[in-house]
A protein has these predicted regions:
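Contiguous beta-strand/loop segments that form the cofactor/metal-binding neighborhood of enzyme cores
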Residues: 149-220, 249-257
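Active-site loop of classical SDR/Rossmann-like NAD(P)-dependent oxidoreductases
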Residues: 237-249, 265
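Beta-loop-alpha module in the N-terminal Rossmann-like domain of NAD(P)-dependent dehydrogenases
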Residues: 2-74
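Glycine-rich beta-alpha junction loops
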Residues: 1, 89-90, 112-119, 167-171, ...
Length: 293
């Protein structure tokens, strides 16, 4: 509670709680953010929706499609908003990339690499297992890192016609690294992720006329270049804020203007991502405990 008290004082929050159910009874706020371990998104979001609160839900949306569909139905039933903190599609430079896609000609390849060595992997090697490395908490590199890459690819090109996910698993059953290969008409998207190696964070979209290159991951999207036979052009714009802030701005706009259409568009995108994640896990034989509930 000491941390909660300090946080509340720093941000001018009138109250703080150590009882979630009691907090949801309060009427001085209308929105809950579920920044929790993956498997807890569903039960905590469900309680908030049933209490009549809007929910900003952390990525990945939840453990599986069954949970996703139930939460969406509850948001409609209680006439509240349910929006994923995707940190990708609200970025100004995502819009820039989308607007320049047509200048690349027919797309022939998409490659995204997201390697980020986890300090918790060191703990794992020493016998201490973090919840991000367990099926109990719906962990793994697909849910933690590659979800951004999937969101980016699906937002630009839609769902793939086919996919395969090849992984290296820990003894706990989750994917510590993996390569997700998604087939689209005319091209293949290859998304690689790792939590036990030091490597690149970059993305390329290759077309017959040119390439869009970015030396950051999809949740950041800075320093974006378009490369053609005529040369290299920096097309990215300055972003004053990070992806979290831009997503919060968008959620506030949707709620303040009661923009149901925009809310449904975001939910449709989130469901496509969940479909890809679930298919990828099935391909790799990854089963979360939530899948059996």
């Amino acid at each position: 509670m000491a941390k909660a008290a300090a946080f509340a004082e720093n941000y001018g929050i009138p109250a703080y709680f150590d009882d979630y159910d009691e907090m949801l009874k309060q009427d001085f706020f209308d929105t809950v953010y579920t920044g929790l371990p993956n498997s807890l998104h569903y039960p905590y979001a469900k309680k908030a929706l049933c209490a009549g609160k809007n929910v900003l839900i952390e990525k990945p949306f939840c453990s599986n499609l069954a949970e996703f569909d139930e939460l969406v139905n509850l948001s409609h039933e209680h006439n509240v908003y349910l929006i994923e903190m995707d940190r990708v599609t609200s970025l100004p430079n995502f819009g820039v990339i989308r607007d320049h896609l047509g200048e690349l000609g027919p797309i022939r390849a998409v490659t995204i690499d997201y390697a980020q060595y986890s300090r918790k992997y060191d703990d794992y090697l020493n016998g201490k297992i973090s919840n991000v490395f367990t099926t109990e908490f719906s962990g793994g590199v697909l849910s933690d890192l590659l979800v951004y890459c999937v969101n980016y690819t699906v937002a630009l090109f839609g769902k793939p016609t086919n996919l395969i996910y090849v992984v290296d698993k820990l003894s706990t059953g989750i994917d510590i690294s993996g390569a997700l290969v998604m087939k689209y008409p005319g091209f293949i998207a290859t998304l690689t992720g790792s939590k036990n190696s030091i490597g690149d964070k970059r993305s390329t979209i290759q077309g017959e006329w040119g390439t869009i290159m970015c030396d950051t991951v999809p949740s950041v999207l800075k320093d974006v270049d378009k490369v053609t036979r005529q040369g290299t052009e920096r097309i990215s714009v300055y972003e004053e804020y990070d992806g979290t802030t831009y997503t919060l701005f968008e959620m506030k706009r949707i709620i303040d203007n009661d923009d149901r259409a925009a809310g449904e568009i975001r939910l449709a995108q989130s469901r496509k991502v969940m479909e890809v994640l679930q298919s990828a896990r099935k391909s790799a034989g990854i089963v979360f405990e939530a899948d059996n509930r």
